[in-house]
């Protein structure tokens, strides 16, 4: 068995009432107490040294990787929805709070008819944004989503970027987005080199034809 010992063997455990009162008094008038009071008063009397902000008139600037209420993105050029209805976000959701209904349009392409997220159940883990192949669902910076009901659902029209505000849509840089040097990290396949050789030969032929003329 191990031999246990006290950290301070010289200190005796108070037994009588007077010893307990004496121990409490000694601990109360130690130097550490006055040091803490001095630091508190010094910070209190400083000007323009407030540790708080005047919410809601002032708000903390959020980082790009902050995970708040979701957003559904559009393509700026065509104004079409990025979501292809693959259902990966619904399958990977560990809170089981995403529901998606898809159907086929007149061209035989899959379209998303209904899309809902139970914001009261969501834990904002970011898995849905990371698994999305089209960067269609991302996390925004809207965190003021208090509701009176426990099950608070957000629907497709609540998350999707309106067309009139599409010009103000900013690409998401948080969870699920590509790195700025993503192109440099892509491993080039043999087909890439074949294409580059063909392009070089075509450029060479074009230059030779121009010189012959």
Swiss-Prot record:
Its EC number is 7.1.1.-. [4Fe-4S] cluster 2 binds at residues 93, 122, 125, 128. GO terms for cellular component: plasma membrane. The keyword Cytoplasm does not apply. It comes from the Bacteria. PANTHER family: NADH DEHYDROGENASE [UBIQUINONE] IRON-SULFUR PROTEIN 8, MITOCHONDRIAL, NADH DEHYDROGENASE UBIQUINONE IRON-SULFUR PROTEIN 8, MITOCHONDRIAL. NDH-1 is composed of 14 different subunits. Subunits NuoA, H, J, K, L, M, N constitute the membrane sector of the complex. HAMAP family: NDH1_NuoI. This is NADH-quinone oxidoreductase subunit I. It comes from Campylobacter jejuni subsp. jejuni serotype O:6 (strain 81116 / NCTC 11828). The gene is nuoI.
């Amino acid at each position: 068995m191990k031999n246990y010992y006290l950290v301070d063997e010289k200190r005796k455990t108070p037994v009588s009432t007077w010893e307990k009162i004496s121990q409490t008094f000694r601990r109360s008038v130690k130097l550490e107490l006055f040091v803490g009071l001095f630091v508190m008063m010094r910070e209190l009397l400083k000007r323009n040294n407030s540790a708080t902000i005047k919410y809601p008139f002032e708000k903390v600037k959020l980082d790009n990787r902050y995970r708040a209420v979701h957003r559904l993105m559009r393509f700026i050029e065509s104004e079409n929805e990025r979501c292809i209805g693959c259902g990966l976000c619904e399958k990977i959701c560990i809170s089981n709070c995403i529901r998606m209904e898809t159907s086929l349009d007149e061209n035989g392409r899959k379209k998303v008819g209904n899309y809902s997220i139970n914001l009261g159940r969501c834990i904002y883990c970011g898995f849905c944004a990371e698994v999305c192949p089209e960067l269609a669902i991302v996390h925004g910076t809207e965190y003021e989503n208090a509701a009176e009901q426990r099950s608070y659902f957000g629907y497709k029209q609540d998350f999707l970027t309106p067309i009139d505000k599409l010009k103000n849509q900013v690409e998401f840089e948080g969870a699920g987005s590509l790195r700025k040097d993503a192109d440099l990290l892509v491993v080039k396949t043999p087909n890439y080199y074949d294409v580059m050789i063909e392009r070089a030969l075509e450029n060479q032929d074009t230059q030779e034809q121009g010189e012959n003329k």
